[in-house]
Curated annotation (Swiss-Prot):
This is Ribosomal protein uS12 methylthiotransferase RimO. It is found in: Cytoplasm. Residues 33-143 form the MTTase N-terminal domain. One of its GO terms (biological process) is tRNA modification. The gene is rimO. It holds the Pfam family TRAM_2. [4Fe-4S] cluster 1 binds at residues 42, 78, 107. Its EC number is 2.8.4.4.
Length: 472
């Protein structure tokens, strides 16, 4: 959707990993050592799940979609906001009731006491990106099977829980910022960037396997390499600078769509826009702004010069007219007055952002923001949320209407009896809109087609294929 709020959901269930592995490895040898897996939360957590599942398969374990058939269940949790914590605890409860042997990992795992208080019978608890610890615990309770690793047929890219034509590429862990509404640094630690060579190796394998779109994710993507102290890495026999602009430039040469998510508004974001104008990476900028009132931004410990942000948006659009800007905002932050909220609405009117997500402030356990000002009532938060949504829906409809009559590349995600469903450069999977191509039932997921946009609303586009020559 173009304008959305947080709706907690399981990213993957017991069923998804099993089907993914079955499709990738139909000739795998049955070992009898079966693991169930539930993954919750954001794309960064999904990447962690993929890594754990890959190593489990390398070690010879099967992944099952049945609690009854599993020797043990792993639940990879989310702990970002209270709704996510509740969902994670519910998933652990279900796994305990249906199976009884459960290992908990992920962000909520960093709060072991909180989990033990509710579910004292879980076998083991680890924090986020504790891959080795998770596998060690699995080996303890379900002995590593004897098997020939060459019969597992694990793809070179590892296990992926996304469709074959797109994949998330995580470039770092942790975050050095200390936003008062966020507890991620306490869960995942400070910034820890992956070596550039390792990232580019993974990206190359993904593209060679048929991935058409690489979605770059981390807690703070634009900070990539700040912790490297200016040191270069090597890839393909050549030195590579370890900063987000250099990394994006290299990724853009690989022949796939490259989409950047979670860009903190640092000054050097300006350097990414020419790469978008040149077509090296998608002209799509996911840049969470959170608010527009200088007073609230200061309380959030976020950049507070809204005038500079508006100037930057204008400058970016002059350099790259096709630029699509996605952002997220929080309404009902502690101490937010009606005047503060009106400043936010005025900012939306002037900025004319393309894609916007809205969150009603949630009291995250351990967040500094809970104690810095008077909490806003649920009634006021709900009212401001709906006013925000109503305004942004009008803006989104206006921004999408500019595509009508244009011919765009559309990446097909799904095909049903009514036609094909895809996305343009303006649409990230799951969070943005879709492009509906009615009647085109012969297309297949992963195809890239040229289509003329015929209609739009505040969320989605409709199109007709104009070029029968497709690429897959």
């Amino acid at each position: 959707m173009t304008v959305e709020t947080f709706k907690p959901k399981q990213t993957t269930t017991l069923d998804t990993p099993a089907k993914t592995l079955e499709a990738a490895s139909t000739n795998a040898v049955t070992t009898g050592n079966r693991i169930g897996f539930v993954s919750l939360g954001c794309p960064k957590n999904l990447v962690d799940s993929e890594r754990i599942l890959t190593q489990l398969r390398i070690d010879g374990y099967e992944v099952t979609n049945s609690y009854d058939n599993a020797d043990l269940v792993i639940v990879n949790t989310c702990g970002f906001i209270d709704a996510a914590v509740e969902e994670s605890l519910d998933a652990v409860r279900e796994a305990l009731e249906e199976n009884g042997k459960v290992i908990v990992t992920g962000c909520l795992g960093a709060k072991e006491n909180q989990i033990r208080e509710v579910h004292p019978d879980v076998l083991e608890i680890t924090g986020p990106h504790s891959y080795e610890a998770v596998l060690k615990h699995v080996h303890k309770y379900v002995p590593k099977p004897e098997h020939n690793p060459f019969t597992s047929l694990i793809p070179q890219t590892g296990v992926k829980l996304t469709p074959k034509h797109y994949a998330y590429l995580k470039i770092s862990e942790g975050c050095d910022n200390r936003c008062t509404f966020c507890i991620i640094p306490s869960l995942r630690g400070d910034l820890d960037s992956r070596p550039a060579g390792s990232i580019l190796d993974e990206a190359k394998r993904l593209v060679e396997s048929g991935v058409q779109e690489i979605l770059v994710v981390s807690q703070d993507t634009s900070a990539y390499g700040k912790d490297k102290g200016g040191r270069t890495d090597f890839w393909d026999g050549m030195p590579v600078k370890q900063d987000i602009t250099s990394l994006a430039r290299q990724l853009g040469k690989m022949g796939a769509w490259v989409r950047l998510h979670y860009i903190y508004p640092y000054p050097w974001v300006d350097d990414l826009i020419p790469l978008m104008a040149e077509g090296l990476i998608l002209p799509y900028l996911d840049i969470p702004m959170q608010h527009a009132s200088p007073r609230i931004l200061k309380m959030m410990k976020r950049p507070g010069r809204v005038d500079r942000q508006l100037e930057a948006i204008q400058r970016w659009r002059e350099i790259c007219p096709d630029l699509v800007i996605r952002s997220t905002f929080i309404v009902g932050f502690p101490g937010e007055t009606e005047e503060d909220f009106q400043i936010l609405l005025d900012f939306l009117k002037e900025a004319r952002l393309d894609r916007v997500g809205c969150f009603k402030y949630s009291e995250v356990d351990g967040a500094v923001a809970n104690t810095i000002a008077e909490l806003i009532s649920e009634e006021v938060k709900e009212d401001r949320y709906h006013r925000f949504m109503e305004l942004q829906a009008e803006i989104s409809a206006e921004r999408l209407a500019r595509f009508v009559g244009r011919t765009l590349d559309i990446l097909i995600d799904d095909v049903d009896e009514e036609g094909a469903i895809g996305r343009s450069f303006a649409d990230a999977p799951e969070i943005d809109g879709m492009v509906f191509i009615n009647g085109e039932t012969e297309l297949e997921p992963g195809m890239l087609v040229r289509a003329r946009i015929t209609h739009s609303d505040e969320h989605d586009l409709w199109a007709e294929v104009v070029d029968a020559d497709t690429q897959d």
